[in-house]
Curated annotation (Swiss-Prot):
Membrane topology: Multi-pass membrane protein
Keyword Cell membrane: yes
Binding site for ATP: K526
Active site (UniProt): D394
Name recorded for this polypeptide: Sodium/potassium-transporting ATPase subunit alpha
Organism (species): Drosophila melanogaster
Length: 1041
């Protein structure tokens, strides 16, 4: 079994691989240099370019000898390039800078918002209004202003909605700007033997550069000289532990070898000299930037739904408008009347306030999510998260606490579990045994980590530490167990130290002890367990020193295997009291030419560390599973560690085996196991390199629980694309620059607010402010709820379309005076219906929405045929009946019985007729008739408001009874009051008869619509009763939207 220890592997293989991209041979000149970017064809096939970027890096600059390197780049280690050669290279390759992607001009984006979707229909309506008004103005002495006002209102609606949408869109996509912030400004270069400070963008291939502590690496360089040089690759890899760099070639993989340093990473220690091997877009960082900014993300699920809905409604509006325009013509109407009628049909069909309602609903949910640590950058992402069917989660910091913690100890021949919980509420162990005291003394003294200053009130686990992650874990563990570690170190003064190095794989220090009766020096050592064990001849067990025999070695091996198998990083500890006769007080210890014993020591025990899971994660993963969401771990960490964490958080559930587990259980080779028998899979990045997209699809299809370990960022991107090929809606979490391509490609990218790089935050749609996976689950719940509530909101809004359209149809087909005007329709769509529709966004979930599978984007539409059938064919019809009932009542009260109204329209609308007789023989002037008509418009409008009360209440729930759901939504209760008050204001406010042609109504005219409102309530309550009684039955298939 591959065991891991800090010391055994060094750091090179245990940090996450950075994103890199292949450079095929046809992309280079004969001497291995890159071809000029300037001479590339004007149009590069974008898909081929991106496919090239997705390949792993394939270069040999780190393998060749320094002499071959200088020859290839025509440079010299001491003199650098000549000025002429540098100028030639600069002209050939262009500047050492990232090329920004082509942007869509802002005015084009603005025009798309101003003329897309419903907007085009409303513009046509507005233009028709202005045309009709101008014709009326030229043919009539006193033209009516209705069409002018209507045209102005429609134009205003379109412009305001367009500006609103444009503002929302313009806030996103600034990925490239955040990459630019990472680019260093200046670099120290040697040219013709002279040191120069140049702008970083003037560097060229073959330049010899010098970097020191605090600098940013100005290009990808091959290191030729180094002194204690360390770099922080976290901007590329997300792993912040410093990596040592030097001139030696140590690894085939260019990202893991010590002799390469990469553009935009930080030098944190020492100095180095190197030769520039890649510039600008060809650097590792440049390629990530190219990949992240070049990926086409496509539409969000909710945007697709809204476009589908817009096409549906637009189709209905155009079909009805044109059909009845033609019918009006055939029936002999004047073409101008037919145009006015066409405007009415369009205005009545288009829910003008709906896009604003959707945006406001999403904004409200985004605010609610922000209070739960989910900051949404792109509003449409709110719903996307609810549709998510697969989450590809990073491990470090998202599933885990992002701090190495001591998990187990082995002393006195037993494994002791340490407390890894965030609040120290876990297991306790005996801290009084001699074995623990000896082990804790070594861990305290043989440790260079220290707490940073000025953290007095901060809990121990939250304190910042200067030092290596493993040593920081030991320091915090000892501080919790023993108290003030710094004080213990003062009392046991350090005399000499041999720091850890990758050759010896141990660290030794010698101390004076606090025991005044014992003048001897204490030697303490820690390091890779097997290296420590081979330097020991005795072992300390239960307070006694015993000979380290084969039995004890086997016990050690078993413990080491067990802890290593848990994916933990294991360290061994030993000590030795130096005899005072050989090493008297004041002895000069020489750490270069060692003059003290480092063999025949006393072995004391092991300590193992892991970055433990966050407390809330197992529960969150279980919630995802019950919600039908597949959680895949994608990490750059070691497979054993990844599998251990996956098991502890439930990504690999208990009892589910991988191919390797089955082979081990049956004691057969792995090749003999049928992969489909294994529900779980741990896939190594190296295997992924050789896997075709079909094989990847098979892994994703047949394994329900998957861990991808040791993956590079392109592989993360390829995994995301694989999931999307399977039809999944994919959420991806990440924090490093290297994660940005996958974050951008995913349906929803989730970046980390605390540990995340600026680039990952720009590429993402959502930011977790607390870096906690559990917050994603909250987001999923909110996303599902908003989809349900948007359906309710749209059902409510669309229902009033029927009572708005039917008056125009009756006007044409039955030849009656117009029952409802176009301006009045706008008062409903942009006035009384807006607040109630938005209030449905506050509605609570009907049942446990996290117990159902994710929404199928192909079949479960925001607006489906069942919703249209309910809104238009059932509830809308009852509402239209209410409106016509009120219309006929008022007409009859004023002398026009229903029979008299049919066929009267031409006479009614003629200004020349001032003696039209009603059913009782009274004569009506044109002005009196119009006053009565506008009073009917107002009454029809009020009747729609009254039946919309019932519609709002029934839209609260799609399955539950209203009595079960209750009226706890105070926003909705306010909406009921608001629409009533607004309707009354529009009817009774002085001056409205001139502005909106709305007249005061008798109080009794509010009542005829109430029985219809009750009918709607009773009808729908009965429908839902039968829905609950017969789940999946005919009624559900026909009416459950």
């Amino acid at each position: 079994m591959a065991l891991r220890s800090d010391y055994e592997h060094g750091r090179a293989d245990s940090y996450r691989v950075a994103t890199v991209i292949a450079t095929d041979d046809d992309n280079r000149t004969a001497d291995g240099q890159y071809k000029s970017r300037r001479k590339m064809p004007a149009k590069v096939n974008k898909k081929e370019n991106l496919d090239d970027l997705k390949q792993e890096l394939d270069i040999d600059f780190h393998k060749i000898s320094p002499e071959e390197l200088y020859q290839r780049f025509q440079t010299h280690p001491e003199n650098g390039l000549s000025h002429a050669k540098a100028k030639e290279n600069l002209e050939r390759d262009g500047p050492n800078a990232l090329t920004p992607p082509k942007q869509t001009p802002e005015w084009v984006k603005f025009c798309k918002n101003l003329f897309g979707g419903f907007a085009m229909l409303l513009w046509i309506g507005a233009i028709l209004c202005f045309v009709a008004y101008s014709i009326q103005a030229s043919t009539s002495e006193e033209p009516a202003d209705d069409n002018l006002y209507l045209g102005i209102v429609l134009s205003a609606v379109v412009i305001v909605t367009g500006i609103f949408s444009y503002y929302q869109e313009s806030k996103s996509s600034k990925i490239m700007e955040s990459f630019k912030n990472m680019v260093p400004q200046f670099a120290t270069v040697i040219r013709e033997g002279e040191k120069l400070t140049l702008r970083a963008e003037d560097l060229v291939l073959g330049d010899v550069v010098e970097v020191k502590f605090g600098d940013r690496i100005p290009a990808d360089i091959r290191i030729i000289e180094a002194r204690n040089f360390k770099v922080d690759n976290s901007s590329l890899t997300g792993e912040s532990e410093p990596q040592s760099r030097g001139a030696e070639f140590t690894h085939e993989n260019p990202l893991e070898t010590k002799n390469l340093a990469f553009f935009s990473t930080n030098a944190v220690e020492g100095t180095a000299k190197g030769v520039v091997i890649s510039c600008g877009d060809h650097t590792v960082m440049g390629r990530i930037a190219g990949l992240a900014s070049g990926l086409d993300t496509g539409e969000t699920p909710i945007a697709k739904e809204i476009h589908h809905f817009i096409h549906l409604i637009t189709g209905v509006a155009v079909f009805l408008g044109v059909t009845f325009f033609v019918i009006a013509f055939i029936l002999g109407y004047h073409w101008l009347d037919a145009v006015i009628f066409l405007i009415g049909i369009i205005v009545a069909n288009v829910p003008e306030g709906l896009l604003a309602t959707v945006t406001v609903c999403l904004t409200l949910t985004a605010k609610r999510m922000a209070s739960k640590n989910c900051l949404v950058k792109n509003l449409e992402a709110v719903e996307t998260l609810g549709s998510t069917s697969t989450i590809c989660s990073d491990k470090t910091g998202t599933l885990t606490q992002n701090r190495m913690t001591v998990a187990h100890m082995w002393f006195d021949n037993q494994i002791i579990e340490a407390d890894t919980t965030e609040d120290q509420s876990g297991v306790q162990y005996d801290r009084t045994s001699p074995g623990f005291k000896a082990l804790s003394r070594i861990a305290t003294l043989c440790n260079r980590a220290e707490f940073k200053g000025g953290q007095d009130g901060v809990p121990i686990l939250k304190k910042e530490v200067s030092g290596d992650a493993s040593e920081a874990a030991l320091l915090k563990c000892m501080e919790l167990a023993l108290g003030d570690v710094m004080n213990i170190r003062k009392r046991n003064k350090k005399i000499a130290e041999v720091p850890f190095n990758s050759t010896n794989k141990y660290q030794v220090s010698i101390h004076e002890t606090e025991d005044t009766n014992d003048p001897r020096y204490l030697l303490v050592m820690k390091g890779a367990p097997e290296r420590i064990l081979e330097r020991c001849s005795t072992i300390f067990i239960n307070g006694k020193e015993k000979v380290l025999d084969e039995e004890m070695k086997e016990a050690f091996n078993n413990a080491y295997m067990e802890l290593g198998g848990l994916g933990e990083r294991v360290l061994g500890f030993c000590d030795f009291m130096l005899p005072s006769d050989k090493y008297p007080n004041g002895f000069k210890f020489n750490t270069d030419d060692i003059n003290f014993p480092i063999d025949n020591l006393r072995f004391v025990g092991l300590m193992s560390m892991i970055d433990p899971p966050r407390a809330a994660v197992p529960d969150a993963v279980a919630k995802c599973r019950s919600a039908g969401i597949k959680v895949i771990m994608v990490t750059g960490d070691h497979p054993i560690t990844a599998k251990a964490i996956a098991k502890s958080v439930g990504i690999i559930s208990e009892g589910n085996e991988t191919v390797e587990d089955i082979a081990q259980r049956l004691n057969i080779p792995v090749s003999e196991v049928n992969p489909r028998e294994a529900k779980a899979a741990v896939v190594h990045g190296a295997e992924l390199r050789d896997v075709s997209s079909d094989q990847l699809d098979e892994i994703l299809r047949y394994h329900t629980e998957i861990v991808f370990a040791r993956t590079s960022p392109q592989q993360k991107l390829i995994i995301v694309e694989g999931c999307q090929r399977m039809g999944a809606i994919v959420a991806v979490t990440g924090d490093g620059v290297n994660d940005s391509p996958a974050l951008k490609k995913a349906d929803i990218g989730v970046a980390m607010g605390i540990a995340g790089s600026d680039v990952s935050k720009q590429a993402a749609d959502m930011i977790l402010l607390d870096d906690n996976f559990a917050s994603i689950v909250t987001g999923v719940e909110e996303g599902r709820l908003i989809f349900d509530n948007l359906k309710k909101s749209i059902a409510y809004t669309l229902t009033s379309n029927i009572p708005e359209i039917s008056p125009f149809l009756a006007f044409i087909l039955c030849d009656i005076p117009l029952p409802l005007g176009t301006v009045t329709i706008l008062c409903i769509d942009l006035g009384t219906d807006m607040v109630p529709a938005i209030s449905l966004a506050y509605e609570h979930a009907e049942a446990d929405i996290m117990k159902r599978p994710p929404r199928d984007p192909f079949n479960d539409k925001l607006v489906n045929s069942r919703l249209i059938s309910m809104a238009y064919g059932q509830i809308g019809m009852i509402q239209a009946a209410a409106g016509f009932f009120v219309y006929f009542v008022i007409m009859a009260e004023n002398g026009f019985l229903p029979k008299k109204l049919f066929g009267i329209r031409k006479m009614w609308d003629s200004k020349a007729v001032n003696d039209l007789t009603d059913s009782y023989g009274q004569e009506w002037t044109y002005r009196d008739r119009k006053t009565l008509e506008y009073t009917c418009h107002t009454a029809f409008f009020i009747s729609i408001v009254v039946v919309q009360w019932a519609d709002l209440i029934i839209c609260k729930t799609r399955r539950n009874s209203i009595f079960q759901q209750g009226m706890r939504n105070w926003a909705l209760n306010f909406g009921l009051v608001f629409e009533t008050v607004l309707a009354a204001f529009l009817s009774y406010c002085p001056g409205m008869e001139k502005g909106l042609r709305m007249y005061p109504l008798k109080l009794v005219w509010w009542f005829p619509a109430i029985p219809f409102a009750l009918a709607i309530f009773i009808y729908d309550e009965t429908r839902r009763f039968y829905l609950r009684r017969n789940p999946g039955g005919w009624l559900e298939q026909e009416t459950y939207y």
